[in-house]
């Protein structure tokens, strides 16, 4: 028998989340963001459940090629663009849309021999200071690209660092409007948070990511609790051992937890080598036999320990939900000082994955 841990991907939830994102986007077209192997869910496993989208946005050429080979004919956007001039031959062959964020990429496009023009997303730095042209550089970069025979449809693209708040989009929007003055151009600005909460950012294309997988862009599940969004990934395991502690007994590496009285604890077949956060402290929520309880002691490579006080009937073989419909991944992440995005992406290869 295999170790009892398994991740389950709910394709119906994925389809529902896409429909909710579509409704939130109004009349805007929708890029479904499937970077990082579809946020750890497996791009080859989930893309068909997102087939009603208008396009896929990702990073890796390998994933773009996979989608084309699987029969996807609608647009694919490379969010970080191409990394070497030689990549343009691949973009041409597979008809990929690319972001452009640096002058060297404009030069490469000017010099490339392509069979047909490529659609381009000109990336503006709206204040996040990662990729993109500064606002005062946008017009010049736009005009250069517009003059190239290798450039087809040209779209202005930007990203919000703080779209969870109204203030977080107001100032970047001002910069974008100033930079785009006089340019007749489609725009793609909205990430998940902006798609849900800031319709003034929607424009021509929105780019939802984390909400497709049923977690909150703010990191707070309560912010999307009434939206209809559903967790797509559920991570479950079983109790594989039980210990009866006396008062003063310690648990796990570093003896970080000490029982204040007589207490039963369960040992769960899941650890940080499976992608569970190593820094999850005592008190992190977990569900055993349908009852909410908590992690106690340090997370080990292959095991965690949980308090069985709320579920005295639990024993060997009892079902454990680490995150999913009942234990929100955002709550586990928040307790552990991280975000749901990271936990999804950190799911280890050794964890079996099934779909339903």
From Swiss-Prot:
Enzyme class, spelled out: isomerase
Gene from which the chain derives: alr
Keyword Transcription attributed: no
Organism classification: Bacteria, Pseudomonadati, Pseudomonadota, Gammaproteobacteria, Enterobacterales
Protein name: Alanine racemase
Chemical reaction(s) catalysed: L-alanine = D-alanine
Domain of life (superkingdom): Bacteria
PANTHER family named among the record's database cross-references: ALANINE RACEMASE, ALANINE RACEMASE, CATABOLIC-RELATED
Organism: Erwinia tasmaniensis (strain DSM 17950 / CFBP 7177 / CIP 109463 / NCPPB 4357 / Et1/99)
EC assignment: 5.1.1.1
HAMAP family: Ala_racemase
């Amino acid at each position: 028998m295999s170790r009892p841990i398994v991740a389950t991907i709910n394709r119906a939830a994925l389809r529902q989340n896409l429909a909710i994102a579509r409704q939130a986007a109004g009349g805007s077209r929708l890029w479904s963001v499937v970077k990082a192997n579809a946020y750890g869910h497996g791009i080859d496993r989930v893309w068909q459940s997102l087939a009603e989208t208008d396009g896929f946005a990702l990073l890796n050429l390998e994933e773009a090629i996979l989608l084309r080979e699987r029969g996807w004919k609608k647009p694919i956007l490379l969010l970080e663009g191409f990394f070497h001039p030689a990549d343009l031959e691949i973009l041409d062959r597979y008809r990929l849309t690319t972001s452009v964020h640096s002058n060297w990429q404009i030069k490469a496009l000017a010099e490339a021999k392509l069979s047909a023009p490529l659609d381009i997303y000109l990336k503006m730095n709206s204040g996040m200071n990662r990729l993109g042209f500064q606002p005062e550089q946008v017009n010049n970069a736009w005009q250069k690209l517009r003059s190239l025979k290798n450039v087809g449809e040209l779209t202005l693209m930007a990203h919000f660092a703080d779209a969870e708040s109204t203030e977080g989009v107001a100032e970047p929007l001002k910069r974008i409007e100033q930079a785009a003055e006089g340019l007749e151009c489609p725009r793609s600005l909205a990430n998940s948070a902006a798609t849900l909460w800031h319709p003034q950012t929607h424009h021509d294309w929105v780019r939802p990511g984390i909400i497709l997988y049923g977690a909150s862009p703010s990191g707070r599940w309560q912010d999307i609790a009434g939206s209809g969004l559903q967790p797509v990934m559920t991570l479950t395991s079983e109790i594989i051992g039980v210990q009866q502690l006396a008062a003063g007994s310690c648990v796990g590496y570093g003896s970080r937890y000490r029982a204040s009285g007589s207490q039963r604890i369960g040992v769960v077949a899941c650890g940080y080598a499976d992608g569970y956060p190593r820094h999850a402290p005592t008190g992190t929520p977990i569900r055993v036999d349908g009852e909410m309880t908590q992690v106690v002691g340090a997370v080990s490579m292959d095991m965690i320990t949980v308090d069985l006080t709320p579920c005295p009937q639990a024993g060997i073989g009892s079902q454990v939900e680490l995150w999913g419909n009942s234990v929100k991944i955002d709550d586990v992440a928040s307790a552990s000082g991280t975000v749901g995005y990271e936990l999804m992406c950190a799911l280890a290869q050794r964890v079996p994955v099934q779909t339903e």
